[in-house]
């Protein structure tokens, strides 16, 4: 198996929710000499230093400061969250001899693939420990849940456009009636805490099926949450491998992109603005110096793109239709759902040439409305010259997505050059 793809799959396996993804990045950065900063403490920023700061345990910004002073930020933005089903408060529902869990939809999930596959629960618990309120990350590492389909004999419309009702059709089966009252006991045991100490929770279902590399030449990688952990992983690896000599290099991974980014840990928050300003102040510069730095800086907003589908080619633009493993996709939208313009696209294409990787173009069909992503949302807080890009993938927002091995390697390589 390709080494980079193997590392990506390990990263994804250990990151069933945004909380674990950020914890994995924290571990990788700490292992590579980065120092953690706290938002509620004073920062000491030095030339040659490597740092990271976390907000809500689900968003992270890591950065390096070159030995020789620089006032330019090179930023790659991605996101830590993926569509899922979130556990509601008081989740156990006992009906007809079964225990189900009450869930609600998080983000724009593709629902059908969630059926008839082993699932479990991960996220965080808020607990009282030694008279202190603290977070405990938790992964229930066993096949614990399943959302069973209704047999075709009882739903003749199943293959002809049946519309799923999340409140009725998507409730996962936890056990027989004898399992009543045991859900939080199971979660508490997995977290190493007492059930009675749980004060709150942010728990999500996750697909237990492991990722894999496949295809006639092992050219495809399939796994849960490729959107957008594939980009987050590539940016992280690029920052660790980069020389970091020419600019202040910033790896930014925000939460809640799939639900609009309008949280304190989302792209619409002040997290990036606060961090860049504090870096600038920590280096002894004025607020005007900070504004000058922003005018010189560049951001790559990295969120996966739709590859042309083998069975639905008509869903793609007739000309601009990205292929898997044919290059990083530069994303355009006339209505500014993406930040890419002629200038930022030209700069990115030159960066691709420097890195020795290919790029291609993604544009929606003119009769299909596209969604926005990190770039234009974060620009409402920090005005930066920005290009929107993505790695082409299939089955976006499915609990099991497919992308390209080569594209992952190319983005790691490009990120390393960008972070030179």
Positions of PLM-derived features:
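N-terminal hydrophobic/helix-forming segments and targeting peptides
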Residues: 1-420
